[in-house]
């Protein structure tokens, strides 16, 4: 497993950035760079609860939230994959990376801007996908957050 981190400074309030990260109408905009299929997030937003990152065919990832401090930080721990709506959290391949964290932190800087810091643990074979996804995705979050007309 490899730990990757990504950062971007955004001139917007933390809550606005948080909402852009996780609101259904904006989540698909910044995550479009990770795969060809649009991905949605379905979560009960509870520590120990269930979170799905899936496409329209119900294929994707299943995770749980291990830390939630809105609008400052959330940590997802990936548990397995979802294929055709069925969870796989038991296979040997899954057990190699099950529990891998994905953390989003919003840090207020001295000048009033906010640093969005993402840290994710992945299998090295997915590094290129993550680099492309987060590099482009964080730019999209910044653009949306710094637009005046986006509701807070």
Task: Tell me what each language-model feature is.
Residues 77-78, 83-135, 152:
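Beta-strand/loop substructures that line and gate deep hydrophobic ligand-binding cavities in soluble
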Residues 3-10:
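Short amphipathic
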Residues 3, 60, 99-101:
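Short, mixed charged/polar active-site loops
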Residues 138-149:
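Short amphipathic alpha-helical signal-transduction/dimerization elements
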Residues 11-31:
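Amphipathic alpha-helical segments
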Residues 5, 25-62, 73, 152:
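Short beta-edge strand/loop motif at the mouth of beta-sheet-based domains
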Residues 57-59, 67-74, 80-84:
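Short, charged/polar surface micro-motifs in flexible loops or helix N-caps
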Residues 11-15, 66-73, 105-115, 143:
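A short, structured loop/turn motif at beta-sheet edges
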């Amino acid at each position: 497993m490899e730990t990757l981190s990504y950062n971007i400074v955004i001139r917007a309030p933390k809550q606005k950035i948080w909402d852009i990260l996780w609101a259904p109408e904006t989540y698909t905009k910044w995550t479009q760079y990770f795969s060809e299929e649009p991905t949605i997030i379905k979560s009960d937003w509870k520590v120990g609860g269930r979170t799905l990152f899936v496409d329209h065919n119900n294929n994707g990832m299943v995770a749980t939230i291990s830390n939630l401090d809105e609008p400052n930080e959330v940590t997802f721990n990936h548990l397995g994959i979802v294929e055709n709506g069925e969870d796989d959290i038991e296979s040997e391949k899954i057990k190699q990376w099950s529990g891998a964290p994905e953390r989003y932190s919003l840090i207020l800087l001295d000048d009033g801007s906010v640093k969005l810091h993402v840290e994710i643990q992945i299998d090295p074979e997915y590094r290129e996908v993550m680099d492309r996804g987060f590099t482009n995705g964080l730019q999209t979050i910044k653009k949306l957050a710094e637009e005046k007309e986006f509701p807070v």
